[in-house]
Swiss-Prot record:
It catalyses: N(6)-octanoyl-L-lysyl-[glycine-cleavage complex H protein] + L-lysyl-[lipoyl-carrier protein] = N(6)-octanoyl-L-lysyl-[lipoyl-carrier protein] + L-lysyl-[glycine-cleavage complex H protein]. The gene is lipL. It comes from Bacillus anthracis. This is Octanoyl-[GcvH]:protein N-octanoyltransferase. Keywords: Acyltransferase, Transferase. Gene3D superfamilies: Bira Bifunctional Protein, Domain 2. GO terms for molecular function: lipoyl(octanoyl) transferase activity. Disulfide bonds: none annotated. PROSITE patterns: BPL_LPL_CATALYTIC.
Length: 281
């Protein structure tokens, strides 16, 4: 993993911590934040950045989910269970965010030779392994069939998935994003998504193959390690681990120059979300 180590080894990591903003912090704001930071980094106007974030009771759908035949019924079910629903601006499928899920974005500049997609994923996998290295467990990166939003870089312990990684690129910037289920029940989160798909598909044939979710394939880190590991615990581990790779961690929010771009990005993402959910008038 020497190449992923080289990406983590930055002269400075800019730290944008939004993990304790509470229930008013909306997931659409998060995607606008990452797009803004990715653009700044791509232009060379910002150091490599780690952004951490938590959203209360939110289901983030992928573009393919917005094409489900009975989407409205599925969304109504999620709202009845007190979940907000949005469609993200990148690939993948439905994931669950709540107070027990820490999201982390690593944002860095493309190199002249380019950073291939697998290297981006490997970098995040390496970071999580370093964060949890004092536990006597093997963290594997492979697809966990039966999980929600399955992919080849699902992170698992003993074949139970606790994290999923995605990636986005904007004009010379790379954003690698992960959700880490810290506390709560992984199988209950998975059952919620399973029931959503059942209501949104209702046995109809679809062009796209949606996952058949088996709740027992998913668990939180607290369940897997038999020890309560909170979002705050993971944040402390994350910052300590980054300190091993960079001499300087700089707490930050958006700069004055970044705010107008953020506002533009947010409006674009809101409009796209409304279109995907059929909320346009």
């Amino acid at each position: 993993m020497s190449n992923s180590r080289s990406i983590l080894s930055q002269p400075e990591w800019r730290i944008v911590d939004q993990s304790s903003l509470g229930p008013t912090f909306h997931a659409l704001q998060s995607f606008a934040m990452d797009d803004t930071l990715c653009t700044s980094i791509g232009k060379g106007e910002s150091a490599a950045t780690m952004r951490s974030w938590v959203h209360h009771n939110t289901i983030v759908l992928g573009i393919q989910d917005s094409r489900l035949p009975h989407l409205e019924e599925g969304i109504s079910f999620l709202k009845e269970n007190n979940f907000n629903v949005i469609v993200r601006n990148s690939g993948g499928l439905a994931v669950v965010l709540d107070e027990g899920v820490l999201n982390v974005s690593l944002l860095f500049q493309e190199t002249e030779k380019g950073i291939d997609i697998d290297l981006g994923y490997d970098t995040m996998w390496h970071l999580i392994q370093e964060m949890l290295k004092d536990y006597d467990v093997t963290i594997e990166a492979k697809e966990i069939v039966g999980s929600y939003c399955p992919g080849s870089y699902d992170l698992s312990i003993r074949d139970q998935k606790f994290a999923g990684i995605s990636q986005r690129r904007i004009r010379g910037g790379v954003a690698v994003q992960i959700y880490l289920c810290a506390t709560g029940s992984g199988s209950e989160r998975a059952a919620l998504v399973r029931d959503f798909y059942n209501l949104a598909i209702q046995g109809e044939e679809t062009r796209f193959t949606y996952p058949e979710i088996v709740p027992s394939t998913m668990a939180s880190l607290s369940e897997l390690l038999d020890e309560t590991i909170t979002v705050q615990d993971l944040m402390m581990r994350l910052l300590k681990t980054l300190q091993q790779f960079a001499p300087k961690l700089t707490p930050s929010q958006l700069t004055i120059d970044e705010i107008p771009l953020y506002e533009t990005n947010l409006q674009r993402i809101i409009d796209r979300n409304n279109k995907a959910l059929g909320l346009e008038k």
